């Protein structure tokens, strides 16, 4: 008898993956600029590389989490790294486990920075207000644990991607007359002084770095979701999210390059695109950006806190509050654009190292099962 699939569950997992992926960097389009659009005509190369990494790694996380019935998502690192011997595996796994938790927490700080920049650029609010409001909402959600997080993310994700597509499709069309000349200008390096770029001019390295930093976001999250739910539903939902995420990224690149004269130097390029449509759309989209920041900030803080405390305990709640407040304070003193470039770029390359362990483990497991 065939195992049935649940359409609602698939859409829920798809929405959760979209929500987790589309945080401050994507919703503001700052990471799209740095990883993809800054490569001009070669942006599609970076997108394809990142998409391949996204699909393979997330299938592996969910499948192995389910197969091994992992109780804690972070244990997935020990599984992959143990393929090179117990002693080395334990050391490498411990490094990735703690480092990924720290990276997820620092990515939460990036989200706070994104909230600050959005609130300041669109509404003229003082630096700190956006981060404080975000932190209050995130702490309140994380305290409810993984089930509460999934419930929240699955509902908000589709709304965010629809609004991003709405703005990017319209501005991609209005920017078409300038696309060719702007693309040539970006290719010629005329915007290198204002457009930060990951990969040092290599779109393959940029795509690898982009896929790499997302690995460290999704590893524990999807391994635990895979362990607790029907694997087929999780994997189909994740694959569906790939189409929406990277399809949206491609359209965003066309829109950003088509209007590169106003987007290149902006902290929040997405707002500049929305303003090309109308001020009202910009106001609405600023709220959507905040929602995107929130949906990524929640599981990022959860992953960091979950590493050092058990969900539901008093200690877990206290650490959630303290870590949230500390991240908010840090974000108020470090520029947002610099946070995205340095933190995401460096950790992307480290995440890519994990892929090597994953490939070796998955091949070995596949061969031993024959």
Task: Name each region found by the language model.
Residues 46-60, 108, 159-171, 211-214, ...:
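Selective recognition of specific alpha-helical transmembrane segments in multi-pass small-molecule
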Residues 10-20, 45-52, 94-101, 121-145, ...:
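Transmembrane alpha-helical segments of multi-pass small-molecule transport proteins
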Residues 30-40, 61-88, 259-277, 308:
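Flexible loop linkers connecting adjacent transmembrane helices
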Residues 7-27, 46, 100-104, 108, ...:
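Hydrophobic, membrane-embedded alpha-helices of multi-pass small-molecule transporters
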Residues 24, 101, 127, 138, ...:
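Hydrophobic alpha-helical segments and their helix-loop junctions in multi-pass secondary transporters
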